[in-house]
Amino acid sequence: MNRADLLAIGRQTLTPPDNADPVAWCARNVTHIPDSPFKGGYRPDRWPWVGHALRIFLDPTTRVLAMPWAIQCGKTLTMRLAATYLMANDRGNMVIYMDNQENAKDFTLRYLRPIFNVVPAVRDHLSVHDNAKSDTIDFADGTIVYNNSASTSKDLQRISTRFVFGDELWKWPRSALGESMARTKAYEWTSKKLYASQPGLVGDDFHNLVEMTDRREWHFKAPCCGHLQAYDWSFIRFPESARTDTGWDHRKVEDGTTYECAKCGTRLADTNETRNKCNAEGEFVPMGVAQKKGYVGLHVNALASTSWGSLSVDMLKAKEASDSYGDESGRMIFKTKYLALPWSDDGGTMVTAATASGPPGIRP
């Protein structure tokens, strides 16, 4: 054996496997994301918290991941990518629970099968007997991906599996989450469970699960001073010119709202470019200590991805409905869907003050 052969063997030995980093693997292999607002394949720079969530979930030390995320922040994409990576690199039986069977079947046919078919490392291992119209996905080695209703007792009790994914837990009946977690008892040391949803009510099963985790919050790095900080609604600032005798001019609020850096006070412009810069070096920071080993929580609110001015108008409309008619539905929607926080019947007080001289920010 000559020197060149020895060097080739050495390089092969030292080269990390293709699947060493799940984010890099997804970027290489998921070349198209069917039914996605984004064109092309998976790009980690678009929503950086998705890549961070993938690495955290697929880390061997993570047993349970709870993701209370705002709507339109990549929750479903994260689940699709995680399932695709597992079926290519660490196959095992999986159950994906939705609030009802119709939504479960839709998830398989609309979101899961299409992305599986994009990736040869998954597609090529499907069974020849797999039915492309079925909400059950069969692999040649006997692995099965089920999609079931969390509202049906038999679907929560009849399957033993290694992986459990749960979506839209705010719609699940009481105790369904615990039943789904019990499906992995036979695989306790190699199992993983991922639960993703907008929050529901304080004290419901999903909220209690999140409270058991280390409650990591998505933090951004301010481009003005480099300070790492969480997206906090109290640092939203309305322009003084938007104030009127009766309240706020919604159009001026939408056009002129900014975000104040928690450290240096710089007003960050409400643009996608600003948010991209902020998120580029962001990370999840633990806000507590998990009550069980391997229990991780990841929280993302809409400030990370959505126009601050647009969100501010939504908040003002919700406050006006609450103040004028006692209608709390808008506040509940804003808090659970956009701030990704659980709702309680008392609701708290919604305060608006968003100028440099006024009290800090807006609290729903």
What is each residue range found by the language model?
Residues 1-364:
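Phosphate/NTP-binding elements of NTP-utilizing enzymes
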